[in-house]
């Protein structure tokens, strides 16, 4: 079957009008897992119908699936709270994109989705979002001590900032920063480090050898699932570490120092009978007055287009909980070696890379083994040749590590993952317990959950009858839309677009009315005659809608979708609209993780348009849970992006102070630009010039570490 471009466009628009439009608002409120499962089901239907030469049916299934991928799922509520499901979304999107014969169809659906979203956001009658409960603020609960009054990071932006927003802003296509000079990221001096120099340069261009990658590809690995109780605790082990042995890692390094680093051999694990708690010690770094060596400030060379990988690796290495999980070899307690042999263990590659970075401060290395493993596990990323999105890569890594380390032993070391007090959290006990047990069984448990997993509660409350619907979700990364200026809510032009505003907008109450309102079951009019008329009218619908109904009914997850809306006849819809059906959607944090990762959504659908709005973000961030408890975080790392995704560059900034302290004369902020490193000092770049926040139009991903109240008092007093 051959269709010209006009025919394809007309078909895509017809499918939207018949099969998507009337359900779009309701689908945005549905469970993300159900939406992903249905999109995968539609892809399987597409493949099946191709085999039996039902070309129109196959084309229709593909179009509907593309609408799920580019319209429904990205605009769904739970998509902003990204967890290990995001990796499934990325793989599914790759499956659709690999159907090259359907490339033009996919592009048309993607372009139409962009138009639909623009139109949807422009309609103010159906959606009204208000910030009644501010969940985030940057100022401490008490005045700062005198010596704490000077905190800042170099601010590259000197222009005037904006007013506080209350709406979303759409990215624009800014090409002013597209011309990135790649040579600036390479050598600027020989392999030496001058004493007292603020900038450290690593390696020579000759050392940037392009690794040879393996061609092996692995299939999709299922997540760990368990229905049984955890086994009893295993005997405690001890690790015998031999030091002063030359490392045999495959990663290559270039030295900046004449001092030979101590190396560590793969430790032997022996079972012993002891009731003492297991001690997991870090490798030993030789005593040195060199700050680069002491704090493991290590550069990562860029063989081609891996700056997005290098930047995330530096932030992960700067995440103490994550880094020490590998450096102490504790990760081995949870690694399922039967399911994941050494040849496909991303965990082991991270361990080798982190050990190399930890013991080689003052040098730069090429992370060959890690890149090879990523290439093997995800050949679609085309590492190292293609530029990718850094936060997507982060989620891919976290999801893979979660799979490899999902193990029954996890609960013995992280009991917080299976213990909760619904009353203390102030959640709906029955709804939360049901969701929690189902979520744990489905996704398994891993140390990644302990480090990164947060929980959200979403409530839909009908304003006509008072009925409420509760749903819960987890996240590893908070993906926040960037607000736009409000010219009518605030008059002070000195107010800034702050990170706190993005969070407060995310948790702000949203009023849904008309077609956008929640289909409240208590308010649904059950008129038998209308139902009969609806059944009759459905039989007369086009074959396209009939196909979509069949594909939906055959999906094992069809109950997640629009069966509420399909019960309403035109007559019922008029009655409901006459009564002004209105819903208030509210969102609350109920559990926040030790490490809070925030992604600012700067890119649009085609990934070439970028929102370059200046965002101000604090060194200390306070977030209020639903139960009123304040969780305090301190910033320790950011990933910044210049240019656009196709022609751009990633760098990272990390506080390399061992405890991420940010008091006077304590913080050690370092900028990592591949193998080019800049250490910021207090007498340069205004690092401690009296500010407690930073502003940037390039900040993209932020890493915050939770502070205990005791540590807060010790650090700043």
Curated annotation (Swiss-Prot):
Q: Which PROSITE patterns match?
A: USP_1, USP_2, USP_3
Q: Looking at the record, which segments are called Disordered?
A: 231-268, 531-577
Residue ranges of the USP domain? 298-707
Quote the biased-composition stretches of kind Low complexity, using this chain's numbering: 242-257
Catalysed reaction(s) here are:
Thiol-dependent hydrolysis of ester, thioester, amide, peptide and isopeptide bonds formed by the C-terminal Gly of ubiquitin (a 76-residue protein attached to proteins as an intracellular targeting signal)
Write the record's keywords in alphabetical order, separated by commas.
Hydrolase, Protease, Thiol protease, Ubl conjugation pathway
Q: Which domain of life is it from?
A: Eukaryota
Q: According to the UniProt entry, which residue ranges have a biased composition of type Basic residues? A: 549-564
An example Gene Ontology biological process: protein deubiquitination
Documented EC number(s): 3.4.19.12
Q: Which residues form the active site?
A: 307, 649
Q: What class of enzyme is it?
A: hydrolase
Query: What does the entry list under GO cellular component?
Result: cytosol; nucleus
Q: Where is the composition biased (Basic and acidic residues)?
A: 258-268
Q: Name one GO molecular function term.
A: cysteine-type deubiquitinase activity
Similarity section = Belongs to the peptidase C19 family.
The protein's matches in PANTHER family, at most eight in alphabetical order, are given as: UBIQUITIN CARBOXYL-TERMINAL HYDROLASE
Q: What is this protein called?
A: Ubiquitin carboxyl-terminal hydrolase 11
